[in-house]
């Protein structure tokens, strides 16, 4: 069985410390007859949503440095370190260009979300379009400055903030309960009408997808496919 050693290169989540602790674990794996040390997992998740490009560059430069030093240490001990894997949607070009990583792991680029949309970007950075939306219907208009929609906490994740409305200027989703969302209508803006269908951009695409059994694939206002979310709830 091929095994990667996860190294903490700045995310402070899982992973052994770079350097000697990673070497010790790699050596233990290499010494087991049923295992083969395959390389390092050096993913810096926290860097993906650093807002300024300079912050992301600095974080990944340090991550790449730690990964490179650890790889060299392991190889000097006579253990092959064939893979260094990491990177995400917010930084993949930096890992790609580092000369250290030979496998990249971006995933959110397929859908994007409101939180990634808050990242500042350099002019030459790759930009991915938003493709994941949650449709919701206006179910009540109790006041000129307020509307209620039928999407709430059961329809989208809020760990990275409330969803944003797509193509609906002047509307802001300010609060969500299980099956209701409270919409604030900006002064001078035309409020939505009862029964209007509105399109939401989720704050965080990953846990939002996990709430659904199916993704409805639409092109030019026509449904082209239904994609099952096969891994929904597969948490063990």
Give, region by region, the residue ranges found by the protein language model.
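Structural beta-strand/beta-sheet cores of well-ordered domains, especially the beta-sheet scaffolds
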Residues: 1, 33, 77, 82, ...
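Active-site loop/helix belt of alpha/beta enzymes
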Residues: 2-4, 8-122
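Glycine-rich, flexible loop/turn motifs
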Residues: 12, 138, 223
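Generic structural signal for well-ordered, non-membrane alpha-helical segments
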Residues: 22, 56, 60-67, 127, ...
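Solvent-exposed alpha-helices and their adjacent loops that cap or buttress functional pockets
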Residues: 30-33, 76-78, 96-97, 130-131, ...
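Active-site loop ensemble at the mouth of alpha/beta enzyme cores that anchors a bound cofactor
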Residues: 56-58, 91-169
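C-terminal accessory subdomain/extension
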Residues: 141-236
């Amino acid at each position: 069985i091929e095994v990667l050693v996860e190294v903490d290169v700045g995310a402070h989540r899982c992973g052994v410390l770079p350097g000697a602790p990673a070497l010790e674990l790699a050596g233990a794996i290499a010494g087991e007859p049923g295992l083969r040390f395959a390389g390092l997992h050096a993913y810096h998740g926290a860097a993906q949503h650093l807002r300024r490009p300079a912050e992301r560059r600095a974080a990944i430069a340090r991550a790449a440095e730690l990964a490179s030093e650890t790889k060299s240490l392991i190889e000097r001990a006579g253990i092959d370190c064939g893979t260094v894997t990491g990177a995400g949607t917010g930084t993949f070009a930096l890992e790609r260009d580092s000369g250290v990583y030979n496998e990249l792991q971006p995933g959110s680029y397929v859908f994007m979300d409101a939180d990634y949309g808050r990242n500042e970007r350099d002019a030459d950075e790759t930009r991915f379009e938003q493709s994941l939306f949650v449709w919701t219907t206006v179910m009540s208009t109790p006041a000129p400055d307020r509307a209620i929609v039928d999407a709430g906490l059961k329809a989208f994740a809020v760990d990275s903030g409330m969803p944003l409305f797509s193509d609906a200027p002047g509307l802001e989703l300010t609060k969500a309960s299980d099956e209701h969302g409270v919409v604030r209508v900006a002064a001078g803006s035309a409020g939505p009408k009862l029964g209007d269908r509105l399109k939401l951009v989720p704050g965080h695409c990953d846990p939002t997808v996990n709430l659904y059994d199916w993704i409805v694939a639409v092109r030019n206002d026509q449904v082209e496919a239904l994609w099952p979310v096969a891994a929904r709830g597969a948490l063990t």
